[in-house]
């Protein structure tokens, strides 16, 4: 029994090492540019070992995306509770979720760079709905969170709910995440421009909130 437990622990550690090696390479270059052979070398194992864990590159990419967003969501939940959680009104929750994207830019630019490349890769590879299900479940929790905020706004009136829910989601959190991703990749400023664009995201947050927050006069 002890050997079985040890084997399982070693397999889990090796799998995690392969995923982290892939993440480093994907974030530094792009998903398309990195081969499985390079990932195996980065992880310090042979390619045959890698194939024991991941039959195809999309398998590795999707599991990696699923794991990274689940880890980030756990961070968001912890910060959400520290900020007041469900005691916040809808406007305060929207402020929090925009701040969570800013924190993602500050602390996890590698995830933003990976994410910017992920969608194009899985479309190009024609990944099936079955393959994508774990990933979609991992990221859909953010949309469910927004749905809760929108319902709260309907009740407390602190956000402009004359804007349909999906439209508001796409044009606030989704758009904000997209801009943060472009900043992380250095796409919106020249290479010799500012390296930390947190202030630009804070400005954009103020613009977004100014357009949708409703306070009693």
Regions inferred by a protein language model and the residue ranges of each:
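N-terminal intrinsically disordered/low-complexity leader segments
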Residues: 1-13, 80, 216-217
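C-terminal peripheral helix-coil segments that are non-catalytic and often amphipathic
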Residues: 1-2, 100-103, 144, 148-156, ...
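Generic hydrophobic, amphipathic alpha-helix propensity
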Residues: 11-23, 39, 64-68, 72, ...
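Helix-turn-helix
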Residues: 17, 25-63, 67
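All-alpha amphipathic helical-bundle segments outside canonical DNA-binding/catalytic cores
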Residues: 92, 137-139, 155-173, 199
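Short secondary-structure transition hinges
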Residues: 103-147, 166-167
């Amino acid at each position: 029994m002890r050997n079985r437990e040890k084997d399982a622990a070693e397999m889990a550690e090796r799998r995690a090492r392969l995923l982290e090696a892939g993440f480093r390479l994907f974030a530094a270059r792009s998903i398309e540019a990195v081969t499985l052979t390079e990932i195996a070398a980065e992880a310090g194992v042979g390619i045959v070992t890698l194939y024991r864990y991941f039959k195809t590159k999309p398998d590795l990419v999707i599991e990696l995306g699923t794991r990274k967003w689940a880890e980030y969501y756990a961070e968001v939940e912890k910060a959400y509770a520290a900020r007041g959680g469900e005691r916040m009104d809808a406007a305060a929750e929207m402020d929090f979720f925009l701040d969570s994207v800013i924190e993602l830019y500050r602390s996890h630019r590698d995830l933003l760079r990976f994410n910017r490349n992920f969608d194009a890769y899985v479309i190009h590879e024609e990944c099936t709905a079955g393959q994508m299900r774990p990933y979609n479940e991992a990221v859909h929790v953010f949309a469910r969170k927004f749905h809760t905020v929108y319902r709260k706004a309907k009740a407390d009136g602190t956000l402009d709910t004359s804007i349909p829910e999906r439209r508001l989601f796409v044009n606030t959190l989704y758009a904000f995440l997209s801009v943060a991703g472009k900043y992380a990749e250095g796409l919106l400023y020249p290479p010799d421009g500012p390296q930390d664009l947190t202030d630009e995201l804070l400005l954009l947050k103020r613009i977004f909130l100014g357009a949708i927050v409703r306070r009693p006069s």
